[in-house]
Amino acid sequence: KVFERXELARTLKRLGLDGFRGVSLPNXVXLAR
């Protein structure tokens, strides 16, 4: 499944990873491309 950035961010928040946004979110966005 291809995630859009907002959807990916929402998914990470739902998974409780929002606290890692400084590290995980940019990496996840890069991996999702």
From Swiss-Prot:
Catalyzed reactions:
Hydrolysis of (1->4)-beta-linkages between N-acetylmuramic acid and N-acetyl-D-glucosamine residues in a peptidoglycan and between N-acetyl-D-glucosamine residues in chitodextrins
Instruction: Return one Gene Ontology term, BP aspect.
Output: defense response to bacterium
Q: What is its EC number?
A: 3.2.1.17
Q: Which domain of life is it from?
A: Eukaryota
Q: What keywords is this UniProt entry annotated with?
A: Antimicrobial, Bacteriolytic enzyme, Glycosidase, Hydrolase
The family line of this record is: Belongs to the glycosyl hydrolase 22 family.
Q: What else is known?
A: Lysozyme C is capable of both hydrolysis and transglycosylation; it also shows a slight esterase activity. It acts rapidly on both peptide-substituted and unsubstituted peptidoglycan, and slowly on chitin oligosaccharides.
Which proteins does it associate with, and in what oligomeric form?
Answer: Monomer.
Q: What is this protein called?
A: Lysozyme C, spleen isozyme
Q: Which organism is it from?
A: Equus caballus
Q: What is the lineage of its organism?
A: Eukaryota, Metazoa, Chordata, Craniata, Vertebrata
